[in-house]
A protein has these predicted regions:
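Bacterial N-terminal signal peptides that target proteins for export
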Residues: 1-10
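Non-catalytic accessory regions used for complex assembly or targeting
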Residues: 13-15
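C-terminal motif of bacterial Sec signal peptides marking the signal peptidase cleavage site
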Residues: 18-22
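Bacterial signal peptide processing site
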Residues: 24-27
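First exposed extracellular module after export/assembly in secreted or surface-exposed proteins
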Residues: 30-166
């Protein structure tokens, strides 16, 4: 009798373990790895890229990598067309002087700086510099290279991903 109870208990426990292990937290449902053409496009654009990790954001393929001494997110469409690169700057002191001066003169200069990045686009005549600040709210400030404030975006309760322009 003890043997039967033990066997039943073991069977129930094993069933529970297998049931929960099969319910993984897979956020990449439907993820398709990037094609060789997309991987080649990254190598052509950033030949020295290392620590490459691919993810899919919506319909885009994004390579998280290190290149030129900085952390980058390089965005491609399914046709291996480069759409955008976001480069982390790690500090407002890495901004161009005109952008730093504009930020320091803004009404957000006393807010906590959360993130600083450069957005580069293939078909744009300029680069955008994004300073993310927090103080009760979370705001992305987009500056031109000359220091002009292009626009601001409240990302307090929303998606703070910098998406490619379409």
């Amino acid at each position: 009798m003890k043997s039967l109870k033990f066997s039943l208990l073991a069977a129930v426990l094993l069933s529970v373990v297998f049931a929960f292990s099969s319910c993984g937290d897979d956020d990449d449902t439907g993820y398709l790895p990037p094609s060789q053409a997309i991987q080649d496009a990254l190598k052509k654009l950033y030949p020295n890229a290392t620590a490459i990790k691919w993810e899919q954001k919506g319909v885009y393929y994004v390579a998280d990598c290190q290149a030129d001494g900085r952390e980058k997110e390089v965005w491609f469409d399914a046709n291996a067309t480069w759409l955008m690169t976001e480069t982390e700057l790690n500090s407002i002191n890495n901004l161009p002087p005109a952008v730093l001066t504009a930020f320091m003169g803004s009404s957000y200069s006393n807010w906590v700086v959360d993130d600083v990045a450069i957005l580069e686009y293939p078909n744009e005549p300029y680069t955008e510099f994004v300073v993310t600040v927090e103080q009760g709210k979370k705001i992305d400030l987009y500056f031109s290279e000359g220091g002009g404030l292009l626009h601001e975006k409240d990302v307090t309760n929303g998606d703070d991903t910098h998406w490619p322009r379409t």
